[in-house]
């Protein structure tokens, strides 16, 4: 028997990690407070997700949110948790949530300098069947001197200060970036703390998996149809790509980050502007994927370069391993040239 203890006595928790990053940046501590408040909300949502069946949190709350999705009871709870925790961090001025039609302006006595865009419970249509769901967020600095308003949230993803997502799967995981790579943390239920499990994650240059909803194949444009066909029937005689699609974006994006490959939710005849929302779905995951060395595009430009015009704006999203995304873009350019 060695003398190695099964207990780590100098573990890097996410709380400690956030404080260290703040100290290195010689910041005011506001971003540290904000991230720690976000983590508290994520822990609370994780607990609610685990207890959902017992606590009668499954099912529909009886309303439809601003983007047309039926609101689940867990959606309502998660949204309230995130809003309350962020506003009580004394570091936010504007909040944009998938569940709220208009931006939420923090009251003057609790106001700080950050804007947060978030989806409190992504993939909530999967709640009742116990598939993985998640929370997504992106943090920006307020850039104007005016009174806080919705306009403060209409910033391109290049302005993101920090972004991440939580995945409530077989364990609860947080992927976080403050602009210096992507780190992964796992929730240790015994400690009630997120612990660093992987530092500076890098996506593979090329993967072996493609992920999209092929039920919409009837509506695909020529470029998407051609690309998917190439993955199924490779012209060079190589093995076809595997197909994986959960239907919960956080789960599909995280698998793409870990295993490589490509995730596609392109524009189609049914959703000509795309389906996923730019501010609180596409920008945060595009930021994470780019920080890990991948690419994220709308098919015409990098996602992070899109200048938002509305807080619930939708855009196409294609992301993943750089060589796979580049191959998709080659199909797009070829089809545009052939018109």
Swiss-Prot record:
The alphabetical list of record keywords is:
Calcium, Carbohydrate metabolism, Cell junction, Cytoplasm, Gluconeogenesis, Hydrolase, Magnesium, Metal-binding, Nucleus, Phosphoprotein
Binding-site residues, Mg(2+) 2: 98, 119, 121
EC number per UniProt:
3.1.3.11
Instruction: Write out the residue ranges of the motif Nuclear localization signal.
Output: 204-208
Picking any one GO biological process from the record gives: fructose 1,6-bisphosphate metabolic process
Please list the residues that bind Mg(2+) 1: 69, 98
Bilayer-spanning residue ranges: none
Q: For the region Important for interaction with ALDOA, what residue ranges are annotated?
A: 3-10
Cofactors needed by this protein, per the record, are: Mg(2+)
Name the residues that bind substrate: 122, 213-216, 245-249, 265, 275
Q: Which CDD domains would you find in this protein's record? A: FBPase
Which family would the database say this protein is a member of?
Belongs to the FBPase class 1 family.
Subunit structure, as described in the record = Homotetramer. Interacts with ALDOA; the interaction blocks inhibition by physiological concentrations of AMP and reduces inhibition by Ca(2+). Interacts with alpha-actinin and F-actin.
Q: What is this protein called?
A: Fructose-1,6-bisphosphatase isozyme 2
Organism encoding this protein: Bos taurus (Bovine)
Lineage, uppermost ranks? Eukaryota, Metazoa, Chordata, Craniata, Vertebrata
